[in-house]
Amino acid sequence: MTISQYFPIYDQLDKADQERLDYAAVKRRVPKGTLLHGGDGVCTGLLVIASGQLRAHMISEEGREITLYRLFERDICLFSASCIMSSLQFDVFISAEKDTELWIIPPDFYKGLMERSAVVANYTSQIMASRFTDVMWLMDQVMWKSFDKRLAGFLLEESVLEGSVGIALLTTFPKY
């Protein structure tokens, strides 16, 4: 398994950039529950997901969390490399919801790739637009949909993600 199989525009890069990317990208396996990017100012790099599931979320000062979007096989996480775009000024956390295999492309390398390649710059803009659309949809849900409709949607989404017809809400019952 190589990054060429999971980075959608790999074949559109010139041979030299393909070789640089092959060398720069670091493959990692991360267990469920791992915090990959913590909004702490550290620029993790671009994440290319080979398998598993990641969650991008924000945490309020009171500790409440909101899921912005999820990432699956062949998805790209750009917000973990937001330092390469000076206009992005918010803290996003990226966590593994399932055991995940991914590549990390160092932020400085990716920034250089964007500067050299119009294809990469355009692709990066497409990712940003897609994530912006996801977040706007979420805002619409939170602001304008009733709680019962949001809960029903959440339960349906969870059943699809888990590949089950039902959802286990309690695994053990409290003893009184």
State where each predicted segment sits.
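Phosphate-/nucleic-acid-contacting segments
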Residues: L156-Y176
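Glycine- and acidic-residue-biased ligand/ion/polar-headgroup-sensing regions
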Residues: G33, T44-H57, F72-D75
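Short helix-to-loop capping/linker segments positioned immediately adjacent to catalytic or ligand/cofactor-binding
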Residues: D91-V92, K111-E115, D134-W144, L161-V165
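Cyclic nucleotide-binding regulatory module and flanking cytosolic helices
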Residues: M1-K32, I76, A81-M85
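Short alpha-helix-to-loop micro-motif enriched in aromatics/charged/Gly
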Residues: E61-L68
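Short phosphate-coordinating micro-motif centered on Lys-Gly-acidic
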Residues: L36-G41
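N-terminal positioning helix adjacent to the helix-turn-helix/winged-helix DNA-binding module
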Residues: M143, F147-R150, F154
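Cyclic-nucleotide recognition modules
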Residues: R70-Q126
